[in-house]
């Protein structure tokens, strides 16, 4: 029988899948998303012609500030 279909290994496979997904999510939140946010804010400030450029404090706000629609 194939190991993917053995009921004895379901819990182990599920556990390792959850661990891998949690590690991937943590990596994205800690390293990838802040870099994307910084690049987005820099591009937005350059595209605004420095008239509507965000304040420096906008670069230090939490991740929720990127997704607020009133700033776009």
UniProtKB/Swiss-Prot annotation:
One of its GO terms (cellular component) is mitochondrial membrane. The keyword Transcription regulation does not apply. The chain crosses the membrane at residues 16-36. It is found in: Mitochondrion membrane. It is a single-pass membrane protein. Keywords: ATP synthesis, CF(0), Hydrogen ion transport, Ion transport, Membrane, Mitochondrion, Transmembrane, Transmembrane helix, Transport. Pfam families: YMF19. Its main location: mitochondrion. InterPro entries: YMF19-like_N. One of its GO terms (biological process) is proton transmembrane transport. Belongs to the ATPase protein 8 family. Mitochondrial membrane ATP synthase (F(1)F(0) ATP synthase or Complex V) produces ATP from ADP in the presence of a proton gradient across the membrane which is generated by electron transport complexes of the respiratory chain. F-type ATPases consist of two structural domains, F(1) - containing the extramembraneous catalytic core and F(0) - containing the membrane proton channel, linked together by a central stalk and a peripheral stalk. During catalysis, ATP synthesis in the catalytic domain of F(1) is coupled via a rotary mechanism of the central stalk subunits to proton translocation. F-type ATPases have 2 components, CF(1) - the catalytic core - and CF(0) - the membrane proton channel. This is ATP synthase protein 8. It comes from Metridium senile.
């Amino acid at each position: 029988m194939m190991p993917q279909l053995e009921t004895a290994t379901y819990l182990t496979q599920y556990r390792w899948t959850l661990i891998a997904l949690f590690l991937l999510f943590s990596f994205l939140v800690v390293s990838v998303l802040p870099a994307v946010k910084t690049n987005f804010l820099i591009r937005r400030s350059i595209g605004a012609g420095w008239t509507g450029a965000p304040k420096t404090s906008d670069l230090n706000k939490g991740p929720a500030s990127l997704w607020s629609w009133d700033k776009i």
